[in-house]
Amino acid sequence: MNEAFFAEHGRRQRVFCASLADVFDNEVPGLWRQHLMSLVAKTPNLDWLFLTKRIGNARKMLTEACMHDGLLLTADDQYRPPANLWIGATITSQAEADRDIPKLLATPAAKRFLSMEPLLGPVNLTGLWRHWNASSCEPGELPELMIDWVIVGGESGPGARPMH
């Protein structure tokens, strides 16, 4: 099934987890996150996308969720994400970018992304991309991981604010 999907779409299947909720909200029970992270670890054939407005909670909550199974911790008890976990932060303004992107970059993840919806003002993302330079990388070596993907959009409907 997964091979057929990849052959047709050229990518792995993705699960946009809790798209109408926030896994890292303080009201979400820790036990629920433990079960969720166990499921993520047991489904390496799927890419799991977690988008949050509370990126400041993510690193601590992920570590706590993984400590009980021991599935995702290194020998020195540091959180290590599964290869199929993507973490994203909602950013709508430069102030949010300045505050939250460093928190996103400090959260271990296979991939990191921004959801800039609705984009309510200009945001400078200079310096946050992977820098590919064939002369400075050995084959198979990746430069420092930064932001892998950006989703940009505006609002719709009556009274929608313009996108910048």
What are these regions (language model features)?
Residues 1-164:
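Conserved AdoMet/S-adenosylmethionine-binding subsite of the radical SAM
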